[in-house]
Amino acid sequence: MSRTKGGTVTHARHKKVIKAAKGYYGRRKSTFKVARQAVDKANQYATRDRKNRKRNFRALWIQRINAAVRSHDEALTYSRFINGLNLAGIEVDRKVLADLAVHEPEAFGAIVKQAQDALAA
């Protein structure tokens, strides 16, 4: 039986890794062994940061909402505002609230007023 060499398969696998390392600096873009390590580490970072992106955006939305709420009423805090929304039965998520606070301050002010009324009642 003749010997089977894996040249084409190995070449394709190496080429895939080198292609993924395009734009890297030094041997990280051209040498298979180093490129594979760099690509593996990049994939670890990408996986981790897909999770962190969700946390970061939620934190950003909360900061924006808190700043907007305090600009409408100095005494009202973020947590009391969210409590007021729950008491008023307003079910708007933080992403939409932050967008309203930035782009439509008048509408956000009306929501703040409803939350204050619910807290007072």
UniProtKB/Swiss-Prot annotation:
InterPro entries: Ribosomal_bL20, RIBOSOMAL_L20_CS, Ribosomal_protein_bL20_C. The keyword Nucleotide-binding does not apply. Keywords: Ribonucleoprotein, Ribosomal protein, RNA-binding, rRNA-binding. GO terms for biological process: ribosomal large subunit assembly; translation. It comes from the Bacteria. The keyword Nucleotide-binding does not apply. It holds the Pfam family Ribosomal_L20. One of its GO terms (molecular function) is structural constituent of ribosome. GO terms for cellular component: ribonucleoprotein complex; ribosome. Gene3D superfamilies: 6.10.160.10, Ribosomal protein L20 (1.10.1900.20). PROSITE patterns: RIBOSOMAL_L20 (PS00937). Binds directly to 23S ribosomal RNA and is necessary for the in vitro assembly process of the 50S ribosomal subunit. It is not involved in the protein synthesizing functions of that subunit. HAMAP family: Ribosomal_bL20. Belongs to the bacterial ribosomal protein bL20 family. NCBIfam families: rplT_bact. This is Large ribosomal subunit protein bL20. It comes from Roseobacter denitrificans (strain ATCC 33942 / OCh 114) (Erythrobacter sp. (strain OCh 114)). The lineage of its organism: Bacteria, Pseudomonadati, Pseudomonadota, Alphaproteobacteria, Rhodobacterales.
